[in-house]
Amino acid sequence: MIAVIIGCEIGFWVLLLLGLVVRYLTPARGLSKALLIAVPLVDVVLLAAAVLDLRGGGHATASHGLAAIYIGVSVAFGSQMIRWADERFAHRFAHGPAPTRPPKTGRAHAAHERAQWFRHVLAYVIGAAVLGVFTLLVGDIHRTVPLWGVMVPWAVILGIDFVISFSYTLSPRRS
């Protein structure tokens, strides 16, 4: 399962890079659209691989839990990552405008950090929902305990992210 997760992560970035190369360095707009549309399908491949493994009698492991984390993060942050890469590629290869940068100071920075934390919460909820589906597919809560083991460290990370993100609300960075 770990190999599938790594393959999907590589696939995400390869499809994104190819889509941007084709978009900005060739006249093949249709191919570019197809490649960029295929980027989120990597999540579907990962989800299908995990489901097939569990339905086929595979043991529910922490790697299935990592697959759920990957899917949650990809759904919550994927469009933002694609936009980030697109802005930089357009600027570098198509003489587009300079990429937008998040605010570094003041209330705008605090608002940005809070928004990113809420996006992190969305990723966590999606990951938990995927784990819930995996648990239902296995049909035995005792066999799926290793799946849920990934949620505790993730909750700690989410808590640390909360403290850092919301600290800027109480004490904004000064310019």
Locate the predicted segments by residue.
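Alpha-helical transmembrane segments and their immediate juxtamembrane interface regions
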Residues: 138-175
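Alpha-helical transmembrane segments
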Residues: 58-80, 149-157
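Long, highly hydrophobic alpha-helical transmembrane signal-anchor segments
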Residues: 26-72
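N-terminal signal-anchor/start-transfer transmembrane helix
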Residues: 6-26
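Select subsegments of transmembrane alpha-helices in polytopic membrane proteins
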Residues: 35-40, 114-127
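Alpha-helical transmembrane segments and their membrane-interface junctions
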Residues: 119-144
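Membrane-water interface of transmembrane alpha-helices
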Residues: 76-98, 164-171
